[in-house]
């Protein structure tokens, strides 16, 4: 079995993949996945909101923005180092081997909050787990210090296509997102970068977002695929629910475009049937977020996920630290 790593996919080619009959798309994705990732296993990642609410950004989907009126927009102080590490230990005991930490910031703040972040990264790495941080934009020096602390990956999503982006956020440009990703790469930290469907975008928008990701050289090591969780008090609160099979198509297409990336089944999974989630695994998803909360939105509980993987006949990387994001 062979596959090709490409960075020259066109939007038209990607849209054609998204429009394939579902069974044909799944077959192609599974072929690429088996060729690129022998010994298929699912990585379990746990996600913790270290600093919740009070974010200056105006992302239309986000419950943590000060511009929105959800229940979690009020500022909460950053968690202390030891409670975060206690949560990391608990995540490891539950089977996760990657611990992701989120800060509701526009950009990383220097000083005590950043020093605490570095201590958290070191502590997670000392547990033998991968450490991922998502905290908005950052400087070259901050990226370098995170790399020195042992950070495995930095998450900074594109959210949507360049064409649809201004309908979702106005406080940060698409170019600023790309520049943040470049700083992370320059520091030697792996990228976790994906997007969200169900925000009123077109099929071409989805293809365009995937084209930006697939054009990166190298591809992002981790590609989270999210479905919108419509939160009361946000501009997208009345958005119609995304169609689960559309998320399956996004997973499959991401797998074809970026054969060796970890395609992460992320937010929105709680609203999907077990069968739709298993189809996502069949389509090439090889990571799930594990635990009953993703930052501020719900997620299937640990026991439900254990049963899901068992029923699918999929092995997880229980407490095995991987070298890729």
UniProtKB/Swiss-Prot annotation:
Keywords: 2Fe-2S, 4Fe-4S, Biotin biosynthesis, Iron, Iron-sulfur, Metal-binding, S-adenosyl-L-methionine, Transferase. Pathway: Cofactor biosynthesis; biotin biosynthesis; biotin from 7,8-diaminononanoate: step 2/2. PROSITE patterns: RADICAL_SAM. Its EC number is 2.8.1.6. GO terms for molecular function: 2 iron, 2 sulfur cluster binding; 4 iron, 4 sulfur cluster binding; biotin synthase activity; iron ion binding. Binds 1 [4Fe-4S] cluster. The cluster is coordinated with 3 cysteines and an exchangeable S-adenosyl-L-methionine. Binds 1 [2Fe-2S] cluster. The cluster is coordinated with 3 cysteines and 1 arginine. It holds the Pfam family BATS. InterPro entries: Aldolase_TIM, BATS_dom, Biotin_synth/BioAB, Biotin_synthase, Elp3/MiaA/NifB-like_rSAM, rSAM. Gene3D superfamilies: Aldolase class I (3.20.20.70). SMART domains: BATS (SM00876), Elp3 (SM00729). Signal peptide: none annotated. [4Fe-4S] cluster binds at residues 55, 59, 62. It catalyses: (4R,5S)-dethiobiotin + (sulfur carrier)-SH + 2 reduced [2Fe-2S]-[ferredoxin] + 2 S-adenosyl-L-methionine = (sulfur carrier)-H + biotin + 2 5'-deoxyadenosine + 2 L-methionine + 2 oxidized [2Fe-2S]-[ferredoxin]. Belongs to the radical SAM superfamily. Biotin synthase family. Catalyzes the conversion of dethiobiotin (DTB) to biotin by the insertion of a sulfur atom into dethiobiotin via a radical-based mechanism. Homodimer. This is Biotin synthase. It comes from Parasynechococcus marenigrum (strain WH8102). The lineage of its organism: Bacteria, Bacillati, Cyanobacteriota, Cyanophyceae, Synechococcales.
